Amino acid sequence: MLILISPAKTLDYQSPLTTTRYTLPELLDNSQQLIHEARKLTPPQISTLMRISDKLAGINAARFHDWQPDFTPANARQAILAFKGDVYTGLQAETFSEDDFDFAQQHLRMLSGLYGVLRPLDLMQPYRLEMGIRLENARGKDLYQFWGDIITNKLNEALAAQGDNVVINLAADEYFKSVKPKKLNAEIIKPVFLDEKNGKFKIISFYAKKARGLMSRFIIENRLTKPEQLTGFNSEGYFFDEDSSSNGELVFKRYEQR
């Protein structure tokens, strides 16, 4: 089983590391090409392209400038410990044991605009380059055209290595669009998390993101390898709703706290 999650905009390069082990990203040649394109952008262009403040644009222009392909623990950090958004609040990788990291390294992948696919222990230097950004490059008008089949091929390699054919899609749509489902040698299962609001169940972004992290943690902690085992997920009040689910979509609901 291969779990897919999105990266995060918020990064943490200060907290103590839970593990000293690391690997190197497998698609750095591609990352280097994107950095080459990104370095052509001025801070105002970055601000417009990414819809971010002038201050953040300046920070990210500096990141593009400082990025260099010789990754070491001195200038980079394991991806699963560097990302700090809502998904990662649910995942809580900073509390993983070495055995948890081992399982995650085999079964979890982070999709990334700059790095394509990251394994949990892959070192990464700080960046911001969301998959949906229209950064023109030698291969096309945006990052989807840049990555083409590369991400899908890398996921197929990971599936073949574990002798499995199930992908658990916990990534945002913006990121899963970089995967070609018809070329993926896997059945795709998508967990959906609905929260009750005023008597109706719907996707509430903040809660859904955290729930994707909670589900990832549930799979890793319990060493789950079969999709039917996911129905036992009950973290923070969620429960499986079989009637609302289908073959490719597992629906989990949570009642409003009263």
From Swiss-Prot:
Note the Pfam families from the entry: H2O2_YaaD
* Cysteine disulfide links: none
Q: Which domain of life is it from?
A: Bacteria
An example of a Gene Ontology BP annotation on this entry? response to hydroperoxide
- Give the record's GO CC terms: cytosol
Which HAMAP family does the UniProt entry name for this protein? Answer: UPF0246 (MF_00652)
Concerning its family, UniProt says:
Belongs to the UPF0246 family.
Classification via PANTHER family: PEROXIDE STRESS RESISTANCE PROTEIN YAAA, PEROXIDE STRESS RESPONSE PROTEIN YAAA
This chain's protein is named UPF0246 protein YaaA
Species source reads: Shigella flexneri serotype 5b (strain 8401)
What is the taxonomic lineage of the source species? Bacteria, Pseudomonadati, Pseudomonadota, Gammaproteobacteria, Enterobacterales
